[in-house]
Amino acid sequence: MTKHHADNERIKRQYFAFLKDAKGNSETTVDAAAKAINRFEVYTKHRDFKLFHVEQAIAFKKHLAEQNGQRSGQKLSKATLYATLTQLKGFFHWLAGQPGYKSRLQYSDAEFFNLSDKDTRIATARREQQAPTLAQVKYVIQSMPSGTEIERRDRALIAFTFLTGARDSAIASMKLKHVDLIANSVDQDAREVKTKFSKTFRTFFFPVGDEIREMVAEWVAYLRDDKFWGNDDPLFPATRIALGATRQFEASGLEREHWSTASPIRTVFRDAFASAGLPYFNPHSFRNTLVRLGQDVCKSPEEFKAWSQNLGHEQVLTTFLSYGEVACQRQGEIIRALATPQQAAQSSPDEFADAVVKRLRNSGVDISTK
């Protein structure tokens, strides 16, 4: 049974290079494209792309809609269908302009990978993002053991995520020198820290509790004072795996190196929430928690702008659109409160006049009568 087609492999390599070097896409995006194209090739039994016709796209859409997810065991979601087909649409649109394919494919052929308007709306609909409450996060952190250095690292890791709102990929690549306990800040330098869109910015510790900051400070002090680690050593080092007494590989302290991916961080979160008897919330959900906290504590546009910048957002609109929707329960509270008639506060003419006079005097205007 054919596992690949030589011409297909060559043109795919060109496309992946185009995505990475011309379009500037990340490795994650390129991998998503490769996965989608492979799904299609498996379905067509690796038929030459030059023999593509629109009936293949139509049949593949039906086939994909009938497939079950490997993890869930249920039908693939509309969002998964949309993401896969969008990648294929982009690939075949590009392919139609390449030498050797121009005479066989038309740009409009790629349009047959579109979902119906109804399914597209379902796939792209915005849904309320789940996030833990402040009390839940603190309960999880306080429930975590701290007897071994691995346990101390794990507890400090979740506390640090809560304190800074940093993304897991950034945390996995941070060094000790990036944390300033005097200024209560973290320098997310894109030259060394894997930030989103390679942005460089400074994050000041969010006001989530002195006990949370203290856990992070104790961890930094442990690495610097007890283990004598320096500025370029990892803030949250990887777990050392060694052969144990039972001749089985097991965790044995910490390696003096970074985690290669953020996957172990998500595992720490999953285990911590499970041990606390709470549903799993991933590291990114803490950013939603912090946005909701900001909506409560910020009293002016300037304050919320600073809060937004602290999350690495250049525009406040990003915070509102991506994270800042009003939680459903809070939405109900606001609407019910608005249904209650409220007495509008009105100033008397004398009060208004006094306010004007005060403002003029503060501005240095001479209003004395002559």
Where are these regions (language model features)?
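N-terminal core-binding DNA-recognition domain of tyrosine recombinases/integrases
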Residues: 13-28, 34-126, 143-146, 224
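Short, charged phosphate-coordinating catalytic segments
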Residues: 98-101, 161-186
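Basic, Lys/Arg- and aromatic-enriched nucleic-acid-binding interface segment
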Residues: 134, 138-168
